[in-house]
Amino acid sequence: MKCPFCNHLHDKVVDSRESKEGDAIRRRRECLECTRRYTTYERIDEVPYMVVKKDGRREKFDRQKVLGGLLKACEKRPVSMAKLSELVNRVEYKVSDSPDREISTIDIGEYLMENLRELDKIAYVRFASVYRDFQDEQAFFNELKHLMRQKMS
């Protein structure tokens, strides 16, 4: 590493420890030329997760946005915050697991509906009504019939 005082390229690490926040490694270095000491921080280069919208736009993955949609669907339902948080964690893991760190809103919506169907049927229907953008009561009724058929089999 280049010394900030004399621009010499060789140094030695005198001390190394985790930062107070735990998100970096703090290193004390000593220049082998001028013997002055300086501090460097080593951090993970975080590439943000991206969500590909239906119109092709990309925006940063927002955990709170996903959780907010789930909270609305589960309002006044017996679904714990821990379960919802776990579900958002699984979505986040799916994004981080993809090689390009991207996921489409379609994949997120389908994954959430699949999991909500198991968690709480009413929350599932509420979420589906917004996600699938039902235009009339017939579309809503068809989704309920589909859900009932799945329950019977």
Swiss-Prot record:
Domain of life assignment: Bacteria
Keyword Amino-acid biosynthesis belongs to the record: no
Cofactor(s) essential for the protein: Zn(2+)
Cofactor binding, note field: Binds 1 zinc ion.
GO biological process, one term: negative regulation of DNA-templated transcription
Molecular function in Gene Ontology: ATP binding; DNA binding; zinc ion binding
Alphabetical keyword list: ATP-binding, DNA-binding, Metal-binding, Nucleotide-binding, Repressor, Transcription, Transcription regulation, Zinc, Zinc-finger
Claim: Ribonucleoprotein is one of the keywords in the record: no
PANTHER family in the record: TRANSCRIPTIONAL REPRESSOR NRDR (PTHR30455:SF2)
Function: Negatively regulates transcription of bacterial ribonucleotide reductase nrd genes and operons by binding to NrdR-boxes.
NCBIfam families for this protein: transcriptional regulator NrdR (TIGR00244)
Protein name: Transcriptional repressor NrdR
Organism: Solibacter usitatus (strain Ellin6076)
Lineage of origin: Bacteria, Pseudomonadati, Acidobacteriota, Terriglobia, Bryobacterales
Originating gene: nrdR
